[in-house]
């Protein structure tokens, strides 16, 4: 904003209705969704991903433009959270994740996964497990295998002590 660039309808009317008042608020909220991972890199628009881990992408915040920017840097799937819904998609598989069950119920053609059940008291762990199963059916087996290997390493190291 300090560079005088136009931001148009950003934050969007839906963002504003949800309590986001500035573009900085929106960016911080997006970064917060990444959890506690360290930022490994920042990609300019159109640059390919080179470093494993959490990378931030410097690109416009418009949904369609942002999804296209993600695809241009090598993204295989866009996980798009929404509280109001959007029918857009892009040439990379775009999964829309509802933050409320009303939206998921009213727009089943737009929403792929309902995460709104968390605020209806479904345990976060259960929702996460269902989500991982949904986006990658084989991932549950990989996670179980990784946990088993980690436990086996701990057991071996405790026996050596």
Task: State the predicted function of each range.
Residues 1-161:
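Anaerobic metallocofactor- and corrinoid-dependent redox/one-carbon enzyme cores
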């Amino acid at each position: 904003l300090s560079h005088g660039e136009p931001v148009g309808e950003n934050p969007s009317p839906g963002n504003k209705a949800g309590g986001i008042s500035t573009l900085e608020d929106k960016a911080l909220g997006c970064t917060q969704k990444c959890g506690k991972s360290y930022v490994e890199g920042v990609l300019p628009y159109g640059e390919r991903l080179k470093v494993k881990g959490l990378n931030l992408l410097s690109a416009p915040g418009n949904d369609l433009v942002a999804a296209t920017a993600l695809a241009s840097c090598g993204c295989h799937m866009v996980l798009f959270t929404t509280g109001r819904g959007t029918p857009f998609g892009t040439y990379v598989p775009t999964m829309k994740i509802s933050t409320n069950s009303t939206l998921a119920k009213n727009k089943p053609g737009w929403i792929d996964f309902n995460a709104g059940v968390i605020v209806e008291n479904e345990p976060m762990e259960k929702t996460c497990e269902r989500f991982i199963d949904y986006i990658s059916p084989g991932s549950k087996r990989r996670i179980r295998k990784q946990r088993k290997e980690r436990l086996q390493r701990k057991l071996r190291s405790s026996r050596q002590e």
